């Protein structure tokens, strides 16, 4: 199979070479001077300084010494008639001899007839040639691509400002021979085969054509089995229909196999090459090639009897054709090496000729181009005061709006306006401001095609005809009497025209017109050009310079292209991309980036190559505290049972991951580690059998290769995990299943060799014996570790740099990275070409500069930051250049943008190495760090390159200095080599950014008591020394925070007591007001009541209490409710315990607190924090190791679910950070094979289980209520031995509440 693409490539190169060889002149040294032998009469010009023809050959010194026009302006030109079509390869110019007259820049135009000129272009833009700097030196230009023409025209653009236009010219080339056939739209050529059937496995068809119309068949052939090949013009584009043996695909109903080209009805030559090998086809029109695979059942194209050129004749009906025939000329027509036109000229018996001639007859049609949307117009005279009016012309444009015609009618008839508005043709006759008549017709007339318009008015009837179809008459025009005027303004109005001779309510027309008739008389536009007829401004006469800016389509990633006369637009709405050319992905490149943005676990789309071609892939981002896992699900993650498979009839299952293999490879290659769990459950079903034997089961990986090793084993070793551990059931085998036992067992493990992942298929061959059965499960592809986002290097000498291969980005370039520095300036990166270059640098402490040159001169964009950028913090830079704009973005500052010029060079051509962190001159080097450098979505592996480069170190420390604020709610940022993590030890929250609330539902009897003691970690894997748990048992301040939802009042929320009878209490009074009670230093109890609302109202409330020394503040729901100063030297003595909910000990509570405590707290509480301690989090997460006691039922839940619901009902919300759960059972899951009996049995079991649970809970509740005090004592005795003895004894608080309390109401 691999040999076919190779053969295709070889044949394609061979055929392309032969085609170009056939079309190139036979003289390989095609550089002969062609103008030096011409007579003076072969030269003509727009005007001449002396009024007579002046020979303008190179080095001419006689007479005036060359050509100069009468006036030096942009309308002048010099042309020569070379006598016949020749191949032109170079040009040269001089100034006029002995003068100060020379041209400094010019353009070239070519023509076969001296009419309908074509401008010379390079890079799809009108090319400007550099001219002379004096009168005598010769400036020679080799054409990038040769031109075949008879007439050449030099158009001066700029000249010596101290002189005038002056030229002596030469063109170089050689003779050009070709075979041409002219088709008049009713004729064809038939090439009859020598045998009945022509069957070919490969074809090469080449030709050149010029067409007079937008539709017509160039050639056609078909066979009886449905084979056909047809090339036809459709609305100015070439459509190729090709089918190989598919009888269902008929030409009349099938869509084209490929469509190429645009504006091919411009009466200029266009080249076509069709190369086919089997079903692989290359279709080339001019310089654009489309490769496709054709439909069909075979590789051979079977054509019966003949090929027809110019039309599709109907068998048995001479002169009748199935489709519109071709009208124009075809040149050098070759079919598989056969020169068809040469055979026809020599009247060979294989050719049957219709009304075909062998020279190209072309009508002398003169088009004009309206260039400027504000100043272009054409004024033509008419015959005034005729009863009626007759005007017709053809136009083509890309603009939806524009004035086509304005004329003031005689005899007070009003003004006639014809315009395009929204692509619709609109005819209006108005008197003053009153609209007398209006006709609308057509749609989408800005499609770039030629459209014919005719206006006829006689007496009181107006007829508007568009493309030979008459529009419905105006309903209110029956009484209009029209008399023709004497001036007709086409395209626009003069700027200095102030009267009603020309009205233009919209912008001027930009486009082409031709075949203008007024009063049924054609208008000679060459006379207009010569100044003898009418007037004009900003017109190109004798050429139509329309250009299809959507060919090729520069809208990327499937964006749709539309255009106006001057630019193109991209519609990105149906893509996953954005930007002027749909270049930028709307998705991030990895789960790591989503995590960095503050997202939590969920489904996301990632675009691994950013602006590259791969496209987005849906994944699950499991964003945990330590690793960020990327999971890619496939279509079969359930346990699947297999029976009846054997080597002759194997079982195979392909896995679909919802994306291409390239997308999956990008995810894997961009990760530090990837794995897939594979499980094989077996009963008398062998897996691998022996390391040297043929395996019974294998899997297919990314390269479509078989892999006989199983999970837990390294590649190349035909074993399972138990074989490496020497723990298999049978020591003679290396997998449990290879023991071939008549009972269920399994081999389960992880595949983690990235070059083989993902698993794309599994094949099983040993489940066809008696009692033989297997069940398999392959988990999702899971990866962690972003090798792109944290890939960083440090530059510590100005002369150091990293170099990479040349950055190839001709049409679109985007560069993004992070940097941090303390230097004043330095170059981030630079890439040079011969003239082009691209450079990004920090040019001052507060400025980033992006400079680029694509050949039109440097463009520089600067973003200035209001704050310093050399602050040793990470900053983000993104620079982009495309065919629409150049832009620079720094952090979140306003983007700097510059529109790209529509003309001139547009390819960015670089050829040096890419320098990162410096320049090729080793000057202006960057000092600092660069991270996550991407060019057009591709990661640059900075760290790997830095390992072998002096002056550069891999990695860059100090992420927390920039990203520490991402850790919320008291979380601490911890540095890692490849990033950072948030340590939530001291926070009542959890999650990757300490933003996830830890909350629980309390019942009325629930109590959570935290005993203060030596520092104890409440987060796993955090050492005691690194734990910042509060250690001072005699604090001088309190920072208390909690959130709650309840409907119960009174309620006790929080109780803090000390061994010296000090306490702080937070409770809800009976009326729902919140009360905070402070008793410190044996003072009277301070009671602070906030009764602004009933806080037992099923809504979430947030309380913050802060005391530092004497100053106390209380916030409720983010509003400051109270501020108070205690007496001097107030402090909280040694704290004993903190209780949430009901206080179960006998602590001698005062009456108010006792009332609230009797009710306890029923509701939901979350985010509880006392200084650096999170007691609720400790109870829920680390109850076995933290000094915390729980009485009653405490159920973890989200308080958000309790709002506006029954808070007294205990609701448990189970969540999983990874929806793709794993199963590792010794036997297959019972639901692998579903049955009704299993479902019914399961329901019964669940009901019985629930009943027993209810009985158990009731029994436990009654027991706990009776033994609560005893349990509290026992719990304290279970603390670790290293606790202070003062906390091992039970301490009863004495009732020191004064009879005289201070109470504060807010």
Curated annotation (Swiss-Prot):
UniProt record similarity statement: Belongs to the neurexin family.
Residue ranges crossing the lipid bilayer per the database entry: 1238-1258
Fibrinogen C-terminal domain location: 584-790
InterPro entries assigned: ConA-like_dom_sf, EGF-like_dom, FA58C, Fibrinogen-like_C, Fibrinogen_a/b/g_C_dom, Galactose-bd-like_sf, Laminin_G, Neurexin-related_CASP
Membrane-topology descriptor: Single-pass type I membrane protein
Disulfides per UniProt: 30-174, 329-360, 512-544, 550-561, 555-570, 572-582, 929-956, 960-973, 967-982, 984-994, 1164-1199
Name assigned to this protein: Contactin-associated protein-like 5
PANTHER family tied to this protein: CONTACTIN-ASSOCIATED PROTEIN-LIKE 5 (PTHR15036:SF46), PIKACHURIN-LIKE PROTEIN (PTHR15036)
GO biological process terms on file: cell adhesion
Glycosylation sites recorded in the entry for this protein: 282, 355, 496, 571, 622
Secretion signal span: 1-24
Residue span, Laminin G-like domain: 180-360, 367-544, 791-956, 1013-1199
One cellular component (GO) term of this entry: membrane
Coiled coil: none
Keyword Nucleotide-binding set for record: no
UniProt-annotated location(s): Membrane
Predominant place of localization: membrane
Function: May play a role in the correct development and proper functioning of the peripheral and central nervous system and be involved in cell adhesion and intercellular communication.
Intervals, Cytoplasmic compartment: 1259-1306
């Amino acid at each position: 199979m691999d040999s076919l693409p190779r053969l295709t490539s070889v044949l394609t190169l061979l055929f392309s070479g032969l085609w170009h060889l056939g079309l190139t002149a036979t003289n390989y040294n095609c550089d002969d001077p062609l103008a030096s032998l011409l007579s003076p009469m072969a030269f003509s010009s727009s005007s001449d300084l002396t009024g007579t023809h002046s020979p303008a050959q190179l080095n001419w010194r006689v007479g005036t010494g060359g050509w100069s026009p009468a006036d030096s302006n942009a309308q002048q030109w010099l042309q020569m008639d070379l006598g016949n079509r020749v191949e032109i390869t170079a040009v040269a110019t001089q100034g006029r001899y002995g003068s100060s007259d020379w041209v400094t820049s010019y353009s070239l135009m070519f023509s076969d007839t001296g009419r309908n000129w074509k401008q010379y272009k390079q890079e799809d833009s009108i090319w400007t040639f550099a001219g002379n700097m004096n009168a005598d030196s010769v400036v020679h230009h080799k054409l990038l691509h040769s031109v075949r023409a008879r007439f050449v025209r030099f158009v001066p653009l700029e000249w010596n400002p101290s002189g005038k236009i002056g030229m002596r010219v030469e063109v170089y080339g050689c003779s050009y021979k070709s075979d041409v056939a002219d088709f008049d739209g009713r004729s064809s050529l038939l090439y009859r085969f020598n045998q009945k059937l022509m069957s070919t496995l490969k074809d090469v068809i080449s030709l050149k054509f010029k067409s007079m119309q937008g539709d017509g068949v160039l050639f056609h052939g078909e066979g009886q089995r449905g084979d056909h090949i047809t090339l036809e013009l459709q609305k100015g584009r070439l459509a190729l229909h090709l089918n190989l043996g598919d009888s269902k695909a008929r030409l009349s109903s099938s869509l084209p196999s490929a469509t190429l080209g645009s504006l091919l009805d411009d009466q200029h030559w266009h080249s076509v090459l069709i190369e086919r090998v089997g079903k692989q086809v290359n279709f080339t029109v001019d310089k654009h090639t489309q490769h496709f695979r054709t439909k069909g059942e075979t590789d051979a194209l079977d054509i019966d009897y003949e090929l027809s050129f110019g039309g599709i004749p109907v068998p048995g009906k001479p002169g009748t054709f199935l489709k519109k025939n071709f009208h124009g000329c075809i040149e050098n027509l070759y079919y598989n090496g056969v020169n068809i036109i040469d055979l026809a000229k020599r009247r060979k018996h294989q050719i049957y000729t219709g009304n075909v001639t062998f020279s190209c007859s072309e009508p002398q049609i003169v088009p004009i181009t309206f260039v400027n949307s504000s100043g272009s117009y054409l004024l033509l005279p008419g015959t005034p005061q005729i009863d009626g009016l007759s005007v017709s012309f053809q136009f083509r444009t890309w603009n939806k709006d524009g004035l086509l015609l304005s004329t003031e009618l005689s005899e007070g008839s009003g003004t006639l306006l014809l315009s395009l508005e929204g692509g619709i043709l609109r005819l209006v006759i108005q008197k003053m401001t009153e609209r007398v008549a209006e006709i609308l017709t057509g749609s989408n007339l800005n499609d770039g095609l030629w459209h014919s318009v005719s206006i006829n008015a006689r007496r009181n009837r107006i007829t508007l005809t568009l493309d030979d179809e008459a529009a419905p008459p105006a309903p209110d025009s029956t009484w209009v009497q029209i008399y023709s005027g004497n001036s007709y303004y086409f395209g626009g109005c003069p700027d200095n025209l102030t009267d009603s001779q020309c009205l233009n309510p919209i912008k001027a027309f930009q486009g082409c017109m031709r075949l203008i008739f007024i009063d049924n008389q054609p208008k000679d536009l060459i006379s207009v050009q010569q100044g003898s007829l009418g007037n004009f401004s900003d017109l190109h006469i004798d050429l139509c310079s329309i250009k299809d800016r959507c060919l090729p389509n520069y809208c990327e990633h499937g964006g749709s292209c539309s255009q106006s006369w001057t630019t193109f637009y991209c519609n990105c709405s149906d893509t996953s991309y954005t930007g002027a050319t749909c270049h930028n992905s709307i998705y991030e490149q990895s789960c790591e980036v989503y995590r960095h943005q503050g997202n939590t676990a969920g489904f996301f789309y990632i675009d691994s190559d950013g602006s590259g071609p791969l496209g987005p892939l849906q994944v699950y981002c499991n964003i945990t505290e330590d690793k960020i896992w990327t999971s890619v699900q496939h279509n079969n993650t359930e346990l699947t049972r297999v029976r009846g498979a054997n080597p002759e009839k194997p079982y195979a299952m392909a896995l679909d991951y919802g994306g291409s293999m390239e997308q999956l490879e990008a995810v894997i290659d961009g990760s530090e580690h990837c794995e897939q769990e594979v499980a094989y459950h077996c009963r008398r079903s062998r897996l691998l059998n022996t390391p040297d034997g043929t395996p019974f089961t294998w899997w297919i990986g990314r390269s479509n290769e078989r892999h006989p090793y199983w999970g837990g084993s390294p590649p190349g070793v035909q074993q399972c995990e138990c074989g490496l551990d020497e723990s298999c059931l049978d020591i003679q085998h290396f997998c449990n299943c290879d023991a071939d036992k008549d009972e269920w067992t399994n081999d389960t493990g992880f595949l983690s060799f990235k070059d083989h992942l993902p698993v794309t298929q599994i094949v099983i061959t040993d489940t066809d014996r008696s009692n033989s059965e297997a069940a398999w499960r392959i988990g999702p592809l899971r990866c962690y570790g972003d090798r792109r986002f944290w890939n960083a290097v440090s530059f510590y000498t100005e002369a150091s740099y990293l170099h990479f291969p040349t950055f190839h980005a001709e049409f679109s370039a985007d560069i993004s990275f992070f940097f941090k520095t303390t230097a004043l300036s330095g170059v981030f990166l630079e890439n040079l070409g011969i003239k082009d270059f691209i450079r990004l640098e920090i040019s001052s402490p507060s400025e980033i500069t992006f400079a680029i040159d694509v050949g039109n001169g440097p463009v520089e964009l600067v973003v200035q930051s209001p704050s310093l950028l050399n602050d040793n913090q990470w900053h983000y830079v993104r620079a982009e250049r495309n065919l629409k704009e150049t832009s620079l973005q720094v952090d979140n500052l306003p983007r700097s943008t510059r529109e790209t010029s529509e003309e001139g060079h547009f390819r960015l051509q670089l050829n040096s190495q890419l320098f990162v962190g410096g320049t090729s001159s080793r000057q202006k080097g960057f000092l600092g760090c660069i991270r996550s450098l991407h060019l057009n979505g591709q990661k640059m592996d900075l760290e790997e390159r830095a390992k072998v480069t002096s002056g550069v170190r891999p990695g860059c420390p100090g992420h927390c200095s920039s990203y520490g604020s991402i850790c919320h709610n008291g979380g601490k940022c911890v540095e890692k080599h490849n990033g950072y993590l948030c340590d939530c030890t001291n926070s009542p929250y959890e999650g990757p950014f300490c933003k996830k609330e830890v909350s629980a539902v309390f019942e009325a009897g629930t109590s959570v008591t935290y005993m203060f003691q030596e520092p104890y970690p409440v987060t796993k894997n955090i050492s005691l020394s690194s734990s910042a748990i509060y250690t001072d048992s005699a604090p001088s301040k309190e920072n208390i925070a909690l959130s709650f939802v309840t409907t119960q009042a009174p309620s006790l929320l929080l109780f803090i007591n000390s061994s010296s009878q000090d306490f702080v209490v937070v409770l809800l009074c009976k009326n729902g007001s919140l009360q905070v009670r402070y008793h410190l230093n044996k003072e009277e109890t301070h009671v602070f009541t906030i009764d602004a609302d009933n806080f037992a109202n099923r809504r979430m409330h947030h309380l913050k209490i802060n005391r530092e020394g004497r100053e106390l503040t209380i916030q409720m729901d983010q509003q400051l409710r109270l501020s108070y100063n205690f007496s001097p030297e107030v402090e909280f003595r040694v704290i004993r315990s903190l209780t949430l909910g009901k206080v179960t000990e006998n602590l001698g509570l005062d009456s108010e607190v006792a009332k609230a405590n009797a009710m306890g707290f029923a509701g939901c509480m979350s985010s509880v924090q006392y200084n650096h301690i999170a007691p609720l989090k400790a109870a829920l997460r680390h109850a076995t190791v933290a000094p915390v006691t729980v009485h009653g039922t405490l159920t973890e839940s989200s308080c958000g679910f309790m709002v506006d619901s029954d808070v007294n009902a205990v609701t448990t919300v189970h969540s999983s950070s990874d929806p793709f759960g794993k199963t590792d059972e010794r036997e297959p899951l019972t639901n692998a094979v579903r049955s009704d009996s299993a479902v019914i049995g399961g329901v019964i079991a669940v009901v019985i289980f629930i009943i027993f649970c209810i009985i158990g809970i009731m029994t436990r509740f009654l027991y706990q209520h009776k033994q609560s005090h005893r349990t509290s004592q026992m719990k304290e005795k279970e603390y670790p031995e290293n606790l202070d003895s003062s906390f091992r004894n039970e301490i009863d608080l004495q009732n020191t509440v004064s009879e005289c309390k201070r109470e504060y109401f807010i």
